[in-house]
């Protein structure tokens, strides 16, 4: 058994020429490339989807040693977008019609042993293909290229094709295998290795599953994602005194856990889980889909650790094994979905969609994080015959998980186990989501909200403060009402990050600004809604995000309006120029009472200042303060009750205006300094200070500064933010940042990037060498900054 990473040594042509498949290739203009690769890099916005739609070609030459005689040589592509035909030495050996699942090509019969050989790939990324997700409009770009890893395996003629383990929380398991080649007389050996390293061996026959019980297992859960490793060996017993021979072995990680999805919700190991997740596209600025494993894994870490999600939906296609591996490790539940968007094609299209479902399940079913199969094309109409087939195919391959699928209409035909509904009913008023009984045709089955938010309230990082706040409160309202409604298993916001899209969608610049993060994964205010729902276990877990910059000019008429604090602290203290104003706690009876940590509306900006500085009576001062806070909230308007109270207090309108502008409006008064303190376990653990900007600094954060070149090129994600002297980001800073690098990395995308909403990003890719790398960042009006990276080389 030999394994080779095959991600270097490729050449590429943007225009396919049949000559590229021949061993003796004429002098074609081929460009050396490394995998993952995109057929065309695109600008950040105002891109053209036609640019990546092309028929192109890849070619790789290699030497096949004579020692491979009598062996099986298998070439695996983790994904090629979207229609791939593979040639070996000029001979067509395989065709694959899905851009989101892996496929394996048997090269054995086409090789010339002891000679140079050629593998070529005809890659078609045009969107007129009669395969999913194509055929109708699509609200995301589909890109193109060999964008996931490639590998070569040399095996015996008989080998293991697949292994699958069903493992329950109590320790019971069943192991299924499939083989290729002559296996008469062969046996199986299964080894289960625990997280602590202990091993248990089990023997079995090829014709039957291996059944057993492992005592004392640690179940996989969201909070404790214990992973075990299964290794299955195909053994040919020895004869004439010779030892047994291991023909092949295959390993996979898995978890012992039990799933139930019923009318009351999702139960994991007997405990109900309130799903709180986001939808994720696997695309990135400039590169589209073509990013290495570390960047895929980073998204999972952002979802779980930064945003506090416990679930993610792979909209609208299966995503990389690296992403699912990270979800397994982190305890992030995954709703995996078949490729497609609203359209159902003809019989040929449906046959490919059915094959996509089979590949999706076979390639993802050992991941304990996967809890639901999406077997309907997102948002598509009913098609009883087609969806009976998708459900049957998936249930046959994996009877342990429920099926679902995203509906956009009420009372659709329900052939799945779970009615998943894209609920865009909330417009800022009324209920945050529809009543379950008005949507699902069968209240006895599971129900979840597969999308919300998104198109109903997009927000850009450079939108004004009221708009950014409104998006955050929109997400909070739907999250709250989904939790509050019995029978709703949870919800998935649309979506994790902004993404490029087709001309029919988005804001006219080919971007849908639907994310709680921007395209570079920088957080918007709405990200704090999710992050603040985490249960804190240490001071570092405390979130404190204040919606307002306290700059009155960002609001019509100079009236600051609402100020919300998104936090998971026990309370928040407010100070004005070192004077204590008030301490605020979450309202457990208010609009967001169902959330684990409701956002806090700051409604008092006066506190006891009137007693201290105006000498008002302790009985009178709170009444006047209430009127001043009302004026702040309602743009100097007073209710009839407040006007009557003003008369009873013997205060003139001019007296009131003077105090308003002194303590709230600051007109003619020195600018105030506001300090917000998060209180947890009785002490201040996080502080936010709002005051006029005195200095601007460029903050450069590298999320993965230790890179490993091999088995593919690696990449560092870089976040750039303009911040003030207190670390507050500056949403209206639009300066350009000039980037340059030293050492064994290169910049993906432009070397000069503008800050959008005070934020930007870039990516640094390895170049095949090891060493120290430095990123230099320059911005007018700020000190230069740099970040240091280390690149290791792995063969």
What are these regions (language model features)?
Residues 483-706, 723-725, 733-734:
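Carbohydrate-binding surfaces of carbohydrate-active enzymes
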Residues 37-64, 68-76, 81-88, 94-97, ...:
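Active-site-adjacent substrate/metal-binding segments within catalytic domains
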Residues 1-43, 122, 472-479, 521, ...:
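Accessory carbohydrate-binding/adhesion or oligomerization-edge regions at the termini
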Residues 88, 172-204, 561-583, 674-678, ...:
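Beta-strand-rich binding/interaction modules
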Residues 3-16, 38, 49, 53-160, ...:
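Accessory beta-strand-rich segments of carbohydrate-active enzymes
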Residues 175-178, 232-234, 563-567, 714-731, ...:
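Beta-strand-rich structural segments
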Residues 174, 302, 311-528, 533, ...:
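Substrate-binding/catalytic cleft of secreted carbohydrate-active enzymes
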Residues 112-116, 178-260:
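Extended acidic/polar, glycine-enriched regions
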């Amino acid at each position: 058994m030999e394994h080779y990473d095959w991600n270097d040594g490729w050449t590429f042509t943007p225009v396919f020429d049949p000559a590229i498949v021949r061993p003796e290739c004429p002098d074609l203009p081929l460009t050396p490339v490394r995998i993952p690769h995109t057929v065309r890099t695109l600008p950040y916005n105002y891109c053209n989807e036609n640019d990546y739609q092309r028929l192109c070609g890849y070619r790789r030459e290699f030497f096949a040693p004579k020692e491979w005689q009598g062996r099986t040589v298998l070439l695996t592509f983790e994904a090629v977008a979207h229609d791939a035909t593979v040639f070996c030495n000029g001979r067509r050996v395989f065709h694959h019609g899905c851009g989101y699942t892996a496929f394996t090509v048997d090269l054995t019969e086409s090789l010339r042993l002891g000679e140079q050989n050629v593998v070529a790939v005809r890659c078609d990324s045009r969107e007129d293909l009669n395969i999913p997700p194509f055929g109708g409009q699509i609200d995301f770009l589909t890109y193109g290229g060999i964008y996931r890893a490639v590998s070569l395996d040399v095996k015996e003629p008989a080998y293991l094709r697949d292994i699958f383990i069903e493992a329950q929380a109590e320790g019971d398991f069943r192991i299924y295998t499939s083989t290729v080649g002559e296996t008469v007389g062969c046996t199986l050996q299964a080894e289960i290795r625990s997280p602590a390293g202990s091993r248990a061996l089990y023997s079995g026959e090829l014709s039957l599953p291996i059944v057993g019980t492992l005592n004392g297992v640690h179940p996989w859960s969201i909070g404790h994602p214990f992973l075990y490793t299964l290794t299955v060996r195909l053994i040919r017993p020895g004869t004439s005194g010779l030892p047994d021979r291991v023909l092949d072995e295959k390993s996979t990680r898995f978890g012992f856990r039990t799933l139930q999805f019923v009318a009351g919700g999702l139960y994991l190991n007997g405990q109900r889980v309130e799903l709180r997740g986001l939808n994720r596209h696997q695309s990135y600025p400039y590169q589209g889909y073509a990013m290495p494993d570390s960047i895929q894994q980073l998204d999972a870490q952002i979802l779980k650790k930064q945003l506090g999600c416990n679930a993610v939906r792979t909209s609208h296609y299966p995503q990389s094994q690296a992403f699912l591996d990270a979800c397994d490790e982190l305890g992030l539940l995954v709703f995996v979905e078949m490729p497609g968007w609203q359209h159902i094609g003809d019989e040929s299209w449906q046959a490919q969609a059915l094959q996509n479902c089979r590949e999706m399940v076979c390639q993802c079913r050992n991941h304990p994080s996967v809890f639901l199969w999406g077997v309907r094309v997102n948002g598509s109409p009913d098609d009883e015959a087609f969806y009976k087939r998708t459900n049957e195919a998936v249930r046959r391959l994996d009877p342990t998980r429920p099926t679902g699928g995203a509906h956009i209409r009420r009372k659709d035909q329900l052939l799945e186990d779970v009615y998943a509904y894209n609920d865009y009913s909330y417009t800022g008023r009324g209920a945050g989501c529809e009543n379950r009984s008005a949507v699902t045709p069968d209240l006895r089955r599971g129900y979840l909200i597969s999308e919300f938010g998104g198109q109903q309230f997009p927000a850009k990082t450079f939108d004004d403060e009221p708009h950014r706040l409104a998006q955050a409160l929109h997400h909070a309202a739907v999250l709250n009402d989904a939790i509050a409604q019995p029978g709703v298993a949870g919800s998935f916001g649309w979506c994790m990050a902004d993404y490029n899209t087709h001309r029919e969608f988005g804001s006219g610049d080919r971007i849908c600004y639907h994310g709680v993060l921007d395209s570079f994964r920088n957080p918007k205010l709405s990200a704090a809604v999710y992050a603040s729902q985490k249960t804190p276990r240490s001071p570092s877990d405390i979130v404190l995000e204040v919606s307002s910059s306290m700059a009155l000019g960002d609001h019509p008429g100079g009236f600051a309006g609402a100020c919300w604090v998104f936090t998971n602290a026990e309370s928040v203290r407010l100070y004005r120029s070192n004077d204590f104003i008030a301490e605020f706690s979450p309202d457990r009876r208010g609009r967001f009472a169902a959330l684990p940590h409701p956002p806090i509306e700051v409604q008092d900006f006066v506190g006891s200042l009137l007693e201290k500085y105006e000498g008002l009576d302790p009985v009178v001062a709170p009444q006047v303060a209430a009127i001043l806070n009302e004026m702040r909230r309602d743009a100097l308007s007073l209710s009839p009750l407040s006007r009557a109270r003003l008369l009873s207090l013997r205060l003139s309108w001019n007296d009131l205006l003077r105090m308003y502008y002194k303590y709230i409006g600051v007109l003619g008064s020195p600018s105030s300094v506001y300090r917000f303190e998060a209180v947890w376990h009785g002490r201040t653990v996080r502080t936010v200070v709002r005051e006029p900007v005195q200095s601007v600094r460029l903050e450069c954060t590298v999320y993965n500064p230790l890179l490993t070149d091999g088995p593919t090129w690696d990449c560092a994600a870089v976040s750039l933010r303009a911040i003030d002297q207190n670390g507050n980001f500056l949403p209206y800073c639009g300066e350009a940042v000039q980037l340059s690098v030293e050492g064994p990395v290169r910049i993906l995308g432009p070397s000069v990037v503008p800050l959008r909403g005070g934020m930007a990003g870039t990516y640094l890719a390895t170049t095949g060498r090891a060493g120290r790398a430095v990123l230099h960042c320059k911005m007018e009006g700020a000190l230069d900054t740099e970040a240091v990276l280390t690149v290791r080389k792995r063969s």
